[in-house]
């Protein structure tokens, strides 16, 4: 009987016949999560959470531990692959109106926030020059909180500056948060299967469904294979493609890097933060760049669920995608003209998409005479 239940969950799950390749990224994200937990465990076995030994322990893993270099590269590049998949997954949700399944969407955005926190803590653990200074800049934003800011920052740091207690607690958080991600992922999948996934046409798929296995499982395997191949090729031939050159030097609190920046997958939010010449305003914009995703289900006014047949929304969606890429690029540049203006314009366009959604939905209803 238990075998039958497992089959029902993963094999006989009824899925719409017309879901496209864009629906494959959920299974790819699960694979990334499994890989990160596995490689992370083997790295944690050899890692030392001490400011004097952390950098040396990373070098030791790369040089002395059998296949340690592979574990480290897979973990670092796997994180980038994780974020590429999750950003595409969210973009698909925005384009095809998956956010109207409110509970699934809310759990997914909570999952994104937890993932971003986990990745941030992990970036600090290498104790390279950029890790230290990126952590200093980002955690220092807590001081912008009125009244409580300084106390919160001191509490997070475990002292009056980033030091040994900070590294220890960041390691503890980086170790424990993946289990929260696993729990949230389970909740996300349960909520998704409660209502069923959307499809490219946005129609009710109940009249035309097929079992998940073997039809969609085989389709998922193709992209999964390509992703794992890409991961191993990059890890073997271009292992430092996503690394910052400053991070190959041990952290030195007395020397400030010329240009402080976090990992590439946070650059869009960091670019929005930098575009506002005010600490509190920038911190709020940074938080809102993610939190604004929570309001999307409540601002949908269009009668049609996906953007497949909504040209105005399509235009705004692809503007959002190009804006996201442009902010990411601008955030890698120094804070000087013309990059300041580019960041400010693209940040405004980023928020414009979310604010214009209800107006565009209403306009498209009028254009198509849908009351």
From Swiss-Prot:
Its biological purpose: Component of the ubiquinol-cytochrome c reductase complex (complex III or cytochrome b-c1 complex) that is part of the mitochondrial respiratory chain. The b-c1 complex mediates electron transfer from ubiquinol to cytochrome c. Contributes to the generation of a proton gradient across the mitochondrial membrane that is then used for ATP synthesis.
Record organism: Aspidites melanocephalus (Black-headed python)
UniProt keyword list: Electron transport, Heme, Iron, Membrane, Metal-binding, Mitochondrion, Mitochondrion inner membrane, Respiratory chain, Transmembrane, Transmembrane helix, Transport, Ubiquinone
Major localisation: mitochondrion
Record GO cellular component, one term: respiratory chain complex III
A Gene Ontology BP annotation from the UniProt entry: mitochondrial electron transport, ubiquinol to cytochrome c
Name recorded for this polypeptide: Cytochrome b
Cofactor(s) needed: heme b
Location of this chain's protein in the cell: Mitochondrion inner membrane
Entry-linked SUPFAM superfamilies: a domain/subunit of cytochrome bc1 complex (Ubiquinol-cytochrome c reductase), Transmembrane di-heme cytochromes
Entry binding sites for a ubiquinone: 193
Entry membrane topology: Multi-pass membrane protein
PROSITE patterns reported for this sequence: CYTB_CTER, CYTB_NTER
Gene Ontology terms for molecular function: metal ion binding; ubiquinol-cytochrome-c reductase activity
Xref: Pfam families: Cytochrom_B_C, Cytochrome_B
Assigned protein family: Belongs to the cytochrome b family.
